[in-house]
UniProtKB/Swiss-Prot annotation:
GO terms for molecular function: lactate transmembrane transporter activity; solute:proton symporter activity. Uptake of L-lactate across the membrane. Can also transport D-lactate and glycolate. Seems to be driven by a proton motive force. Keywords: Cell inner membrane, Cell membrane, Membrane, Symport, Transmembrane, Transmembrane helix, Transport. It comes from Salmonella typhimurium (strain LT2 / SGSC1412 / ATCC 700720). GO terms for cellular component: plasma membrane. It is a multi-pass membrane protein. The keyword Kinase does not apply. The gene is lldP. InterPro entries: Lactate_perm. This is L-lactate permease.
Length: 551
């Protein structure tokens, strides 16, 4: 079959081409913000519009276009949706076996204040899970935990998405940084160092921001010591580990340092006023729970599903385990690779997005054993045995999990179908090239490219795979550091995570807000844009004023 070459400027004018390319994204924003459509409806129509743009404007062959949609949809089911199914199942086991009341009580014994619970669960525990697993699992698990602690579901999901900004760049054992190094040929250690000189500023701002969203200026004034302990210890550990150890461990190290510092600090200090959301009858439940005293053994047993989850996910993420399933590894036969018909190596990515014309691979990987979701399922099975849950109850719980998640899973599939048609048609690259045409102002717009990549794909890793080499090329054209621009793609990407349709579908699924995706999108969108502008300002200062900060 003939190789179809991507054309990034079909209109002959990059601004006009990018306007047409942005139609599906503009529709998606409009559908959620103004029309208030349900997530799966908005995603389905977005795929239809993206297909129309790919076929009519980019002249993509019909078979390639349809193949990319199907490939994206299946990628949404596995590995993405599989992670959510397993994560929600672990949470439900904890609730069904009655252990969740003890977890709640143990957190309440550290602090009954929901602003500080947000720091412990949403920030510290969430950052740890991001470092180990990434790909949506942290938001699903922490948001569900917070709803169990009496948080309003919309706030739990929205706040977890926003606070997840801090750890995303080093998520899943530093994969976004390692991928950026692979696609650009730059040293991933240096990219990690640069990200570690941008993100710590954002981390502390984000935590104060979260306090302000929850409880206004009063909340900031009352909680600033705890925020400085949690955010300050995290930021310092993030800087040191990324600059002196490497990009794999900053999240794991920083989150553990922050969790220990914050817990010890809260043993000595509590805010003058205890803040709780005044709804869902949460406070009545909590008084009785807080009065119940549990032994250390009971508390450890109650947390066991999440301890198992932490252990299995960490094991699955370590390089020796991953190497078993890599080409040439002892268990490589366990990974099923299927080249996507009508698509694999039939589309060519062209300069300036890549250095030379490159056939775009499309291989569907069914890693039934080495997927993160399977690691979480193992944690669920260990929990069932350890907590002596009846097999019939466990099967029923798994069934109800699947039933509840059916629509969100469809949404995630459609969102990834849109991401893949955008990538294979060249639509996403047109938008990227338009941003790269902004000349010396590109240092400010560079993070928006990462933001766009994560919005489209739901992953900082995928955003770097798409746009990191373009960032490096643009940097050389305007005479600034390529390491800085590639790092800005990664750091800007983290701010897009909170509005990425994939993240929103996952968060809504975890807290039972299916069909309310538009509410969650409206909750996070302004914060996302403000943070991206902040990263743009930091990057521009580092490019032209604070050049000594570049490694």
């Amino acid at each position: 079959m003939n190789l179809w070459q991507q054309n990034y400027d079909p209109a002959g004018n990059i601004w006009l081409s990018s306007l047409i390319a942005s139609l599906p994204i503009l529709f998606f924003f409009f559908a959620l913000i103004k029309l208030k459509l349900k997530g799966y409806v908005a995603a389905s129509w977005t795929v239809v519009i993206a297909l129309a743009v790919a076929l009519l404007f980019y002249k993509m062959p019909v078979d390639h276009a349809l193949a990319s949609v199907v490939y994206g949809f299946f990628y949404g089911l596995w590995p993405i949706a599989w992670i959510i199914i397993a994560a929600v199942f672990v949470y439900k086991i904890s609730v069904k076996t009655g252990q969740f009341d003890i977890i709640r009580s143990s957190i309440l014994s550290i602090t009954p204040d929901q602003r500080l619970q947000m720091l412990i669960v949403g920030f510290c525990f969430g950052a740890f899970l991001e470092g180990a697993a990434g790909f949506g699992a942290p938001v699903a698990i922490t948001a569900a935990l917070l709803v169990g602690l009496g948080f309003n579901p919309l706030y739990a999901a929205g706040l977890c998405l926003i606070v997840n900004t801090a750890p995303v760049a080093f998520g899943a054992m530093g994969i976004p940084i390692l991928v950026a190094g692979q696609v650009t040929g730059l040293d991933s250690f240096e990219i990690g160092q640069m990200v570690g000189r941008q993100l710590p500023f954002l981390t502390i701002i984000v935590l104060f921001w979260i306090m302000a969203i929850m409880d206004g200026w009063r909340g900031v004034k009352e909680t600033w010591p705890a925020v400085m302990v949690a955010g300050g210890s995290f930021a310092i550990a993030q800087y040191l580990s990324s600059n002196f150890i490497g990009p794999e461990l900053p999240d794991i190290i920083s989150s553990l340092v922050s969790l220990v510092c914050l817990t010890l600090f809260l043993k000595r200090w509590q805010p003058v006023r205890i803040f709780r959301f005044g709804d869902m009858g949460a406070s009545q439940v909590d008084q009785t729970l807080a009065r119940t005293r549990y032994t250390t053994g009971q508390i450890v047993r109650a947390w066991s599903p999440f301890l198992f989850l932490t252990a299995t996910v960490t094991l699955w993420s370590v390089p020796p385990f991953k190497a078993l399933f890599a080409p040439g590894g002892a268990l490589y036969d366990w990974v099923i690779n299927v080249p996507v018909p009508y698509l694999d190596k039939l589309v060519a990515r062209m300069p300036p997005v890549v250095h030379e014309a490159t056939a775009y691979a499309a291989v569907y990987k069914f890693d039934w054993f080495s997927a993160t979701g399977t690691a979480i399922l193992f944690a669920a099975l260990l929990s069932i045995v350890w907590l002596k849950m009846k097999p019939s109850a466990a099967i029923q719980t798994f069934g109800s999990t699947l039933k509840e998640l059916a629509l969100p899973i469809y949404s995630i599939g459609m969102v990834l179908a849109f991401a893949f048609i955008s990538n294979y048609s060249g639509l996403s690259s047109t938008l990227a090239l338009a941003l790269a045409h902004t000349g010396s102002a590109f240092t400010f717009f560079s993070p928006f490219l990462g933001w766009l990549g994560v919005f489209l794909t739901g992953s900082d890793t995928s955003s770097n795979a798409l746009f990191a080499s373009l960032q490096a090329t643009a940097a050389q054209q305007i005479g600034v550091s390529d390491v800085l621009m590639v790092a800005a793609n990664t750091t800007g990407g983290v701010t897009g995570k909170m509005i990425s349709p994939q993240s929103i579908a996952i968060a809504c699924a975890a807290v039972g807000l299916v069909g309310k995706e538009s509410d969650l999108f409206r909750f996070t969108v302004k914060h996302s844009l403000i943070f991206t502008c902040m990263v743009g300002v930091i990057t521009t200062l580092q490019a032209y004023v604070l050049t000594w900060m570049i490694p």
